[in-house]
Amino acid sequence: MGDHLDLLLGVVLMAGPVFGIPSCSFDGRIAFYRFCNLTQVPQVLNTTERLLLSFNYIRTVTASSFPFLEQLQLLELGSQYTPLTIDKEAFRNLPNLRILDLGSSKIYFLHPDAFQGLFHLFELRLYFCGLSDAVLKDGYFRNLKALTRLDLSKNQIRSLYLHPSFGKLNSLKSIDFSSNQIFLVCEHELEPLQGKTLSFFSLAANSLYSRVSVDWGKCMNPFRNMVLEILDVSGNGWTVDITGNFSNAISKSQAFSLILAHHIMGAGFGFHNIKDPDQNTFAGLARSSVRHLDLSHGFVFSLNSRVFETLKDLKVLNLAYNKINKIADEAFYGLDNLQVLNLSYNLLGELYSSNFYGLPKVAYIDLQKNHIAIIQDQTFKFLEKLQTLDLRDNALTTIHFIPSIPDIFLSGNKLVTLPKINLTANLIHLSENRLENLDILYFLLRVPHLQILILNQNRFSSCSGDQTPSENPSLEQLFLGENMLQLAWETELCWDVFEGLSHLQVLYLNHNYLNSLPPGVFSHLTALRGLSLNSNRLTVLSHNDLPANLEILDISRNQLLAPNPDVFVSLSVLDITHNKFICECELSTFINWLNHTNVTIAGPPADIYCVYPDSFSGVSLFSLSTEGCDEEEVLKSLKFSLFIVCTVTLTLFLMTILTVTKFRGFCFICYKTAQRLVFKDHPQGTEPDMYKYDAYLCFSSKDFTWVQNALLKHLDTQYSDQNRFNLCFEERDFVPGENRIANIQDAIWNSRKIVCLVSRHFLRDGWCLEAFSYAQGRCLSDLNSALIMVVVGSLSQYQLMKHQSIRGFVQKQQYLRWPEDLQDVGWFLHKLSQQILKKEKEKKKDNNIPLQTVATIS
């Protein structure tokens, strides 16, 4: 019942903001008058159930201060800014009051009969009120038959001489005397409480027994004939001797839970002049039925042998926040019923196989926040009842010592890899380690009966690719957040890591730098209900990326620009806050869906905002209108069509260029054929003029066969009627018996053009070079470009420049080069024909003005 009232009070303390009740007002049941500068109790309705008057300036409370409030259950008068005077029967008009809170108010005067008439008062709070011993000695609490909780902490009480009326408070279960100045408590002081069973009794932070000399023979047992469920004597600065004497003094009293936290027992680290608890320290508690012993927040350095030997009923032992560095052999001997052992926040560096002997029923061992780096193999193997082992935040580099137990906590260590051991567990917590290879994940997913696997804040970024997934029918929750899975998956390996997890219900992949999701990576997760992908770099999410039965998706803090709403229609809850939405018409479909969907959108609307364009930056998507985007869609279609037309045209153009370039010879032949067919361009001779030949072909006799096949058969009329040129060349047209130079000169001057076929043989033939020189001479004489030079073969510029006669021509005139690709021969012959047919400009005629002799006058 008391727990329910505590919960009720907590609700009341938040009544203003929760129920929307404005300050200094009431709604018929709750009167909310905190911080209202009141100097007296306000008048409220008789239906009021809770009256909150804290943080005001009320000075006096008398019997007439309150109207008759039969339904009032909670009165809060604490934390007044002025000293408070409470007169006789000040609360008699509140007959059904259950909780009276006067805490943190400086009580200037409290009448001994102030609380008379509160027959139903359940809890009385008088903490930090400046009260003295008189409140206990003078019967202030008599007749409070329903009183269960009495809080007198943080006052100025120095002794616990209780008024005999305490013996009649049969409902009293909890008394708090903590943070007073009670230096000594003896048997006769608490005599009115003898025979009672108290759920809580606190003497914490009083410097009890530590500032005075105690004659334990006279003081005797302060809790004689009492049963205490929780006895709190923490924070009193007890040494080993004081603790031992106190244990002996209360040896015949029942104290199920003994809190001795914040003590000064133990040598600490580096000191030897203060004793650690030994075999005699807790010997007096042998018959006290202690089940829970709290020795946390002290300086114990060494757990000595059999230090807890007499505590046969102990089930929970809390040794956290000490300086324990050494556990002696048989330190836990005698703790046959211990179930929970807390050794967290100590200085343990290594554990040995003998450390936990004597704990046959221990189910939970907490060793977190030590410095453990080495653990012997058999340390936990013999603990047959062990259910949970907590080794978080140590310095472990291997786990070969881990037994098969349901819950294993190993986060915050230095694990880089895991040994291949036979392991069975329900929960494995391995976050904040240094695991890198996904082979470790494959191994852990094979652990039988595993239900929860936590691997957050590791370094998973590589994959060997030689692992195969195996069926795990038990795993329900997998935490892989804050790793680097993008680096592993971008190698196209380990995409099958989730294949065997047909019963997985919750998967966390947040903070993994994911740019995209591997195809089908979730396709086998048929039972998945919740998926977290928040704080990644996803820009696109397609329907095939998500499991079919997914209900809850967290994809917040990604880089989604314009998501497709069809991806989310099957969800129940969606968190899409803090993405980088581009608020243009492409987003209109998603905005419309967002405003009309039945899917629960997590997070405040202000967190779903635009980042572009700048005019909409920071604007919530729920505030945007999509009007005008229909015309934009039409324009978009038009733009797309225009894009397609331009793309096709450009593609055809490029393909045409590529085809013509690749098959240019064939294309040229087709062009010439079409020209003849369309324009009836039949071969015909050249126009008659003053020249006997159209061209003189000058070449080396060693090249005759090639010249005949390559040129003469395609150009010379005597080789074919289809040809149009009357050519001159040495082998046919030179007059036998005549001087060779004369033949050359005659051929040069009787031909419209001179075509020199310069090959390697040409450069070695003196007559050819001589003919080239004569041809240059004609060009100089006629001031025209009758000489056509054709380079045949792979002759370099340097080879041509070595010959003086050719050097001058190459430096000043253009020349042709016989094509290397056979398909270019037709085009080349056409170009050569055009050069032969090309007429030179007529030379200007002289005016033929005769010169006359000019007479000189002397």
Swiss-Prot record:
Pfam families linked: LRR_1, LRR_8, TIR
GO-annotated cellular components: plasma membrane
PTM sites of type Phosphotyrosine: 798
Coiled-coil regions, chain positions: none
Topology in membrane: Single-pass type I membrane protein
Gene3D superfamilies reported for this sequence: Ribonuclease Inhibitor, Toll/interleukin-1 receptor homology (TIR) domain
Lineage summary: Eukaryota, Metazoa, Chordata, Craniata, Vertebrata
Oligomeric form and interacting partners: Homodimer. Interacts with MYD88 (via TIR domain). Interacts with TICAM1 (via TIR domain). Interacts with UNC93B1; this interaction is essential for proper TLR5 localization to the plasma membrane.
Record bears the keyword Lipoprotein: no
Role of this protein: Pattern recognition receptor (PRR) located on the cell surface that participates in the activation of innate immunity and inflammatory response. Recognizes small molecular motifs named pathogen-associated molecular pattern (PAMPs) expressed by pathogens and microbe-associated molecular patterns (MAMPs) usually expressed by resident microbiota. Upon ligand binding such as bacterial flagellins, recruits intracellular adapter proteins MYD88 and TRIF leading to NF-kappa-B activation, cytokine secretion and induction of the inflammatory response.
Residue ranges occupied by any TIR domain in the UniProt entry: 691-836
LRR repeat start-end pairs: 45-68, 71-93, 95-117, 120-143, 146-166, 171-192, 197-211, 214-229, 234-235, 260-284, 289-301, 313-334, 337-355, 385-401, 412-431, 449-470, 474-495, 503-524, 527-546, 549-567
Species of the source: Homo sapiens (Human)
Residue numbers of Phosphoserine PTMs: 805
One annotated GO biological process: cellular response to lipopolysaccharide
Domain LRRCT: 579-631
Protein name as it appears in the record: Toll-like receptor 5
Keyword list, A-Z: Cell membrane, Disulfide bond, Glycoprotein, Immunity, Inflammatory response, Innate immunity, Leucine-rich repeat, Membrane, Phosphoprotein, Receptor, Repeat, Signal, Systemic lupus erythematosus, Transmembrane, Transmembrane helix
